Amino acid sequence: MNIIAGFQNNFSEGLYSKFKSYRYKVFVEHLGWELNCPHNEELDQFDKVDTAYVVAQDRDSNIIGCARLLPTTQPYLLGEIFPQLLNGIPLPCSPEIWELSRFSAVDFSNPPTTASQAVSSPVSIAILQEAINFARAQGAKQLITTSPLGVERLLRAAGFRAHRAGPPMTIDGYSMFACLIDV
């Protein structure tokens, strides 16, 4: 497995194109999210030139996982789309808190059989660790993410220091929460 972390301009056009297609396959086709994006490319308003990414590839250079990192000093998913998850707590806006979003570790050539396998897989752990390392190098002390409630237990079981930033809420039928992960 090869994991690359960097800003959009650090990725070749070929890798960035494969990355956009991978996200489309995961979030639109596999998870069924209704997103306003062109066919076979998933990007949103938070994907900009200064957005950071983590991309995992297998030995055949197929993408098997990814994550997006944004400092909370600029618009970010939790702050713009899901602020209710903070239950009235002020939105983080600090160079020391980065948002982790669009996290996936789906290997379409070898898919997991359960949701817990997908979140606790070695690829998931490696992507999260690389995201933490990259964010730390940028000055972050915490990551914040919008996550399904089951992720909290899996993060702790994997040894990450994670806690709730607000109470869980049901959004579109899913129990979600804002999660802080210490870097």
Curated annotation (Swiss-Prot):
Family (UniProt): Belongs to the autoinducer synthase family.
Species of origin: Acinetobacter nosocomialis
Molecular function (Gene Ontology), one example: N-acyl homoserine lactone synthase activity
GO biological process, one term: quorum sensing
Induction summary: Positively regulated by AnoR.
Cited PANTHER family: ACYL-HOMOSERINE-LACTONE SYNTHASE, ISOVALERYL-HOMOSERINE LACTONE SYNTHASE
Gene disruption phenotype: Deletion mutant does not produce OH-dDHL.
Enzyme Commission (EC) number: 2.3.1.184
Pfam family, one: Autoind_synth
Function: Involved in the synthesis of the acyl-homoserine lactone (AHL) signal N-(3-hydroxydodecanoyl)-L-HSL (3-hydroxy-C(12)-HSL or OH-dDHL). Probably part of a quorum-sensing system with AnoR.
Enzyme class at the top of the EC tree: transferase
Keyword annotations of the record: Autoinducer synthesis, Quorum sensing, S-adenosyl-L-methionine, Transferase
Gene for this chain: anoI
Reactions performed catalytically: a fatty acyl-[ACP] + S-adenosyl-L-methionine = an N-acyl-L-homoserine lactone + S-methyl-5'-thioadenosine + holo-[ACP] + H(+)
Protein name: Acyl-homoserine-lactone synthase
Gene3D superfamilies: 3.40.630.30
